[in-house]
Design a protein with these regions (language model features):
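N-terminal domain-onset segments
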Residues: 1-71, 232, 236-274
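Residue-identity detector for threonine
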Residues: 2-5, 14, 40, 56, ...
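Phenylalanine-focused residue identity feature
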Residues: 7-10, 35, 64, 222, ...
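An N-terminal, globular interaction/scaffold subdomain
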Residues: 24-140
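Long, hydrophobic alpha/beta structural blocks
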Residues: 90-293, 297
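C-terminal, beta-strand-rich globular interaction domains
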Residues: 283-390
Length: 390
């Protein structure tokens, strides 16, 4: 829904101005309170306003099935340390880059959204936000390839900028270009960063997790920071540390008490059974008094990831993937994989469906306090790396 722009003398004919309703503003303000300082809270507020307005517009005016492409937890972990929000439309990623600045002489994008292969989007949208007046203005866009080839890099704040003369002002051009040339490349090649060792990552987390470090993204060299930020599990832990939250991803604590609130929002839950009830499912399933489940959507269908402690062997755990619908089967080609916390494979860490099967499973012996990462191919919707701490 667009708003009356007659009072905006600076708005061009092709600019898109969207209303922020009082309800959207109130909700964004409430959601922006879970951050470490006033600066990060304000950044989260601006990002939430732009996200809410743009999603409403895409769904109302274009009937797009648009989504954030990230869970609320992942959004919070990003907004705590940098600016920008990804919106996904039919597999195309748009990064909203909100700013209060009236000056739109350049589109300025944090380096994290340009030089990290897992996070770089197809397009960047410049978004001017005016919270007091209740509107946001989408004033132009560019592709990742355009930003890399024509933009300039500023090491002082680790950002790429593109002059407004190179920014495409009419957002409708984006939709037309996608229709006429859907296969046209939008991204430049990106070299992956060196792997970050686990002990180095832990040292960085302890240092940057201190909320007195007001701008952690500039506190260490970018290769170190980028590797930490790109890893969703480490980024989530950094956010938790900066807010003084501990053991939110402890599997033992989930089983003994309850699943943490943030994990519950992501689809984790706990099921309790009588041991004999679980055993009745067959010898193939390990028995336990309680198991953990994660609800997933893959290719439009519901699945369930289960984490089951072995009844007799301490430290042995079973990961199972199965469909949520009884009698349904996992298609051939699906993969269930476990990795170390620093994303390294290990022996017998993967199960592959060579044909349609009832379930995929992996049994693994885990040391106390060891972290594991689960992966599934094809990727579940809104997937981000999670570190489960045993």
């Amino acid at each position: 829904m667009t708003t009356d722009t007659t009072f905006l003398d600076f708005v061009g004919a092709t600019d898109l101005v969207l209303e922020i309703s009082p309800a959207q503003s109130d909700r964004a303000w409430q959601e922006s309170q879970s951050f470490s300082n006033s600066s990060t809270r304000w950044r989260a507020y601006l990002n939430q306003l732009s996200l809410s307005a743009v999603l409403t517009w895409l769904q109302a005016d274009y009937n797009f099935q648009a989504a954030t492409g990230a869970t609320p937890a992942a959004l919070h972990s990003c907004w705590e340390v940098t600016n920008g929000t990804v919106v996904t439309i039919d597999g195309i990623e748009l990064l909203l880059v909100p700013s209060e600045a009236i000056d739109t002489s350049e589109l300025r994008v944090p380096q994290e959204w340009v030089d990290l292969p897992k996070l770089a989007p197809d397009y960047y949208l410049g978004v001017q936000v005016e919270p007091n007046e209740g509107w946001v203005r989408v004033w132009g866009y560019c592709t990742h390839a355009q930003l890399k080839s024509r933009g300039s890099y500023d090491p002082s704040d680790r950002a790429y900028s593109l002059d407004e003369t190179d920014v495409i002002k009419d957002i409708n051009v984006l939709w037309v270009s996608r229709q006429l040339c859907p296969e046209e490349p939008t991204k430049a090649a990106i070299d992956p960063l060196p792997t970050l060792a686990l002990d180095r990552a832990e040292n960085l987390l302890q240092r940057l997790g201190n909320p007195t470090v007001l701008n952690p993204r500039l506190a260490v060299p970018f290769p170190l920071w980028g590797a930490l930020f790109e890893h969703g599990g480490w980024r989530q832990r950094l956010y938790d540390l900066r807010l003084g939250k501990n053991d939110l991803w402890s599997i033992q604590q989930w089983l003994q008490t309850r699943v943490s609130e943030v994990a519950g929002q992501l689809g984790w839950g706990k099921l309790e059974f009588q041991p004999s009830a679980i055993g009745a499912k067959g010898a193939e399933s390990a028995t336990a008094a309680a198991i953990l489940t994660r609800q997933l959507t893959i290719a439009g269908k519901a699945y369930e990831l289960r984490v089951i402690p072995h009844e007799q062997l301490a430290g042995v755990w079973r990961f199972e993937l199965q469909t949520a619908l009884m009698g349904d089967r996992i298609p051939g080609g699906f993969k269930l994989r476990l990795l170390t916390e620093d994303l390294q494979p290990f022996e017998n860490n993967e199960d592959v469906a060579t044909r349609a099967v009832e379930r995929l499973f992996i049994e693994v012996a885990i040391e106390p306090r060891e972290g594991l990462v689960w992966e599934i191919e094809p990727l579940p919707e809104n997937y981000d790396t999670e570190i489960l701490r045993f």
